[in-house]
């Protein structure tokens, strides 16, 4: 029986996530890879047993959610390919923005006869509808506490063509690695006003170790590993104690390191930090 297609939504639902990753680390990493597609209003991740390996990312614009879904479908995230779909209903934060939010009568829902409850309704009652309903995982993220601070806002990068994956990311279905969608501009031309992606920082000869600079303060080893481990020959990321803005990435050989450097040169981990990559000095 065919599953009805869910219409585009501000919120995307992600499952098949690595359940061993801590909640705070997972939210930071999801923000790091999805913020490039537009303003993120919230990311919902739950510790509950039923919702492990799942998350909701809420964008301000539907187009941002669409770009994220198409570009990142199947992306290897902590060694597992992400499965992404639209949420079936608006999240509360979006409903409030639209003026369609309706406070739920949870007591009435709980008194509903069990014989009339569907599995989806049961989950919605348990979770309080804090997050949108999606696919076979119906209802909200149960037990999610309110955010303790305002969500970080990442503005959409002007000029990014629809469904264009960031440099080096897995392309949409039907495109070979490195191939651009029809009509798309090369990565160096994606963002008008952006500083040119960096000529090589030095004339260092090819090396199997890359030197990264201009990294944002929130960069950590896991974030960089997720970017580079999609390339053949990746071995490890090494951070420099006391310096958040630089790092080293090691590959098996110079050719593999060069391919990763060319693909991720100028990649923006945040809107204001275009990563600069060169071969490390031997």
Swiss-Prot record:
One of its GO terms (molecular function) is U1 snRNA binding. InterPro entries: Nucleotide-bd_a/b_plait_sf, RBD_domain_sf, RRM_dom, U1A_RRM1, U1A_RRM2. It comes from the Eukaryota. GO terms for cellular component: nucleoplasm; spliceosomal complex; U1 snRNP; U4/U6 x U5 tri-snRNP complex. The modification N-acetylalanine is found at residue 2. Keywords: Acetylation, Methylation, mRNA processing, mRNA splicing, Nucleus, Repeat, Ribonucleoprotein, RNA-binding, Spliceosome. The keyword RNA-binding applies. Pfam families: RRM_1. The modification N6-acetyllysine is found at residue 60. It is found in: Nucleus. The modification Omega-N-methylarginine is found at residue 152. GO terms for biological process: mRNA splicing, via spliceosome. Gene3D superfamilies: 3.30.70.330. Residues 119-141 have a biased composition (Low complexity). Residues 10-89, 208-282 form the RRM domain. Belongs to the RRM U1 A/B'' family. U1 snRNP is composed of the 7 core Sm proteins SNRPB, SNRPD1, SNRPD2, SNRPD3, SNRPE, SNRPF and SNRPG that assemble in a heptameric protein ring on the Sm site of the small nuclear RNA to form the core snRNP, and at least three U1 snRNP-specific proteins SNRNP70/U1-70K, SNRPA/U1-A and SNRPC/U1-C. Interacts with SFPQ; component of a snRNP-free complex with SFPQ. Component of the spliceosomal U1 snRNP, which is essential for recognition of the pre-mRNA 5' splice-site and the subsequent assembly of the spliceosome. U1 snRNP is the first snRNP to interact with pre-mRNA. This interaction is required for the subsequent binding of U2 snRNP and the U4/U6/U5 tri-snRNP. SNRPA binds stem loop II of U1 snRNA. In a snRNP-free form (SF-A) may be involved in coupled pre-mRNA splicing and polyadenylation process. May bind preferentially to the 5'-UGCAC-3' motif on RNAs. This is U1 small nuclear ribonucleoprotein A. The gene is SNRPA.
């Amino acid at each position: 029986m065919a599953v009805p297609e869910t219409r585009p939504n501000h919120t995307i639902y992600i499952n098949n996530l690595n359940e061993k990753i801590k909640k705070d680390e997972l939210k930071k990493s999801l923000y790091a890879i999805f913020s490039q597609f537009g303003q993120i209003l919230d990311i919902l991740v739950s510790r509950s047993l039923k919702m492990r390996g799942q998350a909701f990312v809420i964008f301000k614009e539907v187009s941002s959610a669409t770009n994220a879904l198409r570009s990142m479908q199947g992306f290897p995230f902590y060694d597992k390919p992400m499965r992404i779909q639209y949420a079936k209903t608006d999240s509360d934060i979006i409903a409030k923005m639209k003026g369609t939010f309706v406070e739920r009568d949870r007591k009435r829902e709980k008194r509903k006869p069990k014989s009339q409850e569907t599995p989806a309704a049961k989950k919605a009652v348990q979770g309080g509808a804090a997050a949108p309903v999606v696919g076979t995982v119906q209802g909200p993220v149960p037990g999610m506490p309110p955010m303790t601070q305002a969500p970080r806002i990442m503005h959409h990068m002007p000029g990014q063509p629809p469904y264009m994956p960031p440099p080096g990311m897995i392309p949409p279905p039907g495109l070979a690695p490195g191939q651009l969608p029809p009509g798309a501009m090369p990565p160096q031309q994606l963002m008008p006003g952006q500083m040119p992606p960096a000529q090589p920082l030095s004339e260092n000869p090819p090396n199997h170790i890359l030197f990264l600079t201009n990294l944002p303060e929130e960069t950590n080893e896991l974030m960089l590993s997720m970017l580079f481990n999609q390339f053949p020959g990746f071995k490890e990321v090494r951070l420099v104690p006391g310096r958040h803005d630089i790092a080293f990435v090691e590959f098996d050989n110079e050719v593999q390191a060069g391919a990763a450097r060319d693909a991720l040169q100028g990649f923006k981990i945040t809107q204001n930090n275009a990563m600069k990559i060169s071969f490390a000095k031997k």
